[in-house]
Amino acid sequence: MNKKRFGIAGVIAAFALAVSTLVAPTAGAATEIVVWADESRGPNLTKVIAAKGDWVSGYTVKVVTFSSFDALKDAFDKATDASGPDIVVGGNDWVPTGAKSGKLAPIALTAAVKARFNPTQFLDLTYKGKLYGVPVDINNVAMIYNTKLVSSAPKTFGEMVTNYKSLKASKGLKAGLCIAGGGMSWGAHSVFSALGADAYQFNSRGGVVYGRAFSATTFGQNVRKYLMDGKKSNGFFPATDTGCKDNFLAGTVPYAVIGNWEWADYVAKGFTMNLMPVPGVTEGNYGKMFGSVSGALLTTFAAKHGTEAGAKSLLTNFFASTDGQVRYQLLEKRPPAEKGAQADSSVSAAQRGFGSAASLAGIPQVGAFLNSNKGGANYWDSAPAYWTAVLIDGKDAVKEASKLASIWRVNVEAGKGDL
């Protein structure tokens, strides 16, 4: 994911704020709970904790903010018993690697706490039958369109391409559809899927199908038909996300995939949140997006710091509560994961719109599959490499699709044992 390199040096580059409660701590006990988060979540968590600091009696909460999601992940990968946090707010695909490395600790939730969430959300944070955190917010993308360029929601992928070609010269378009949020791996999966390539396959009962990949011929031919002009790109879909957001906001791209963390930027510029999944090549079908949750994850460092009890209470009292998620999402502006927060009147139409798009075309983000490189490369590297090979380097769309299908099939099979 763009979803965004420090070791100990990263902590120096980060900023932190500790907020004290009014409850006197037990003498001699460790009383500071340390939470690590990225450049968006960190400042917002800090503000919420500053406004109400008594989520866990007798403890202070220190939020350490890193410059990006990638910087946070790198720091956590390098964390030691001395430097690591008690809780880290990270992606669900961190769970398999964190559990295997011994840096994440399992947590048991009461039935009452579990009832606050959709059961499938816990699957995102589970590894080998053990839960490692609580769902905080829903992560997904959706497509919007510029109503000054196109008047209605497209029913098919081909309709978007036709509109682009008819408007390209007169409107000075720089692209037809581009990825403004989530990058060319995570954010662009819905384009892969709309054209026939899903990272993994599901049966009619919602179970993963092993040993099978997407049809390289179907996908490759769709790429040729909709994205190519001979051996060159027709300009509709760029192989990079660079400049996409600025170009869409400037009115030179009619369709854009945006992230649910950035919708306010578009509203501020007057755009309607006409959110929808990327339409497929046939009407009524949609490209599937990753619709996962971010989690507040308990670490094994907490027990070593003597703050495990407090960290667990912060997870349930704040991160998993209606009050906590409502307060947090008023600032973070992502769709909340907790049911009570989802129903709260403070949740915006845009937040609900992303939730609806995820319900219509979301698939779980399975880190065990996507992080595997048994096929020669992991999903995150192989996905953008395909667009570069075909749209920039002019390689054959079907032949490259065959290579990609093989990589993803092997990776899914290899990841089966980590579920």
Q: Which residues does each PLM region occupy?
A:
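Short amphipathic alpha-helical coupling segments at ligand-binding clamshell hinges
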Residues: 47-48, 87, 156, 218-223, ...
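Glycine-centered hinge/linker elements that transmit conformational signals in sensory
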Residues: 164, 207-238
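Short, solvent-exposed loop/beta-turn-alpha elements that line the ligand-binding surface or hinge
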Residues: 109-117, 177, 198-222, 268, ...
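Hinge/lid segment of periplasmic solute-binding proteins
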Residues: 92-140, 152, 159-161, 276
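Long, aromatic- and glycine/proline-rich binding clefts that accommodate carbohydrate-like moieties
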Residues: 329-382, 387-389, 415-419
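Conserved N-terminal structural module of periplasmic/extracytoplasmic solute-binding proteins
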Residues: 2, 9-94, 399, 407-419
